[in-house]
From Swiss-Prot:
Active site per the UniProt annotation: D12, D131
Self-association and partners: Heterodimer of HisH and HisF.
Protein name: Imidazole glycerol phosphate synthase subunit HisF
Molecular function via GO: imidazoleglycerol-phosphate synthase activity; lyase activity
Family listed: Belongs to the HisA/HisF family.
CDD domains named among the record's database cross-references: HisF
SUPFAM superfamilies per UniProt: Ribulose-phoshate binding barrel (SSF51366)
GO cellular component: cytoplasm
Amino acid sequence: MVLTKRIIPCLDLKDGRVVKGTHFVDLRDAGDPVELAERYNEQGADEVVFLDITASKEQRGAILSVISRAADQLFLPLTVGGGIRTIDDIQQLLRAGADKVSINTSAIKDPSLISDGAVRFGNQCIVVAVDVRRSTAANPDATVIHLPDGTTCWYEVVIYGGSTPTGIDAVRWVQDAEERGAGEILLTSMETDGTKNGFDLAITAAVSDAVSIPVIASGGVGTLADFYDGVTAGKADACLAASVFHYGEFTVRDVKTYLAGRGVPVRL
């Protein structure tokens, strides 16, 4: 059976509201994540990611109420990330109606969160998000990655939104995460994030080769061809994007039609 490649819009939420602008002119409420997610659902999105960037723990109630509304109204898988530090946090989100949770910095700080979460809730619920940056610092144990310009580097895991280097080799970390029970890897390269120049294909392919669980490519989409490159040269199982969808440069349906026309299996 050929697995279809998934297209996943991502919405950044703060206090239960969407923070990045959106182009949909006929929305009743452009800040309502459930209404936006419904729009993506209609366009054929395979799932939606809500990334909660609310700083404080006190405001977690907002995201929980959004999730329960979304779970009631949407019939597509919902992944929620941001601020998840404990098994109790995971349980609250899943109980509210999330299908999966995405853990990032907390997984590096406490890798047992991956294994405990996988045992308690199932591997399929645990997405490990990995933010990476290129490094040429001496690291004899790191996985050497060959870049398109002929140079080499290794990729370092960065945490706290990309601001803090860890010294950890990205390829080793994703293998470790898989061994601990992660069901999926959400990979964002800080080299390409926000550039609209396409995914960082070198590390995406290296990570996809290094693990047997699905890899979601994130960071850098600007054109329809970038999605194609992500699932072919990048070997990713899914592509995540935010601004190109929010600002209406193209729809999820446009992406899938483009991919299908080039022989990529997608759910239309």
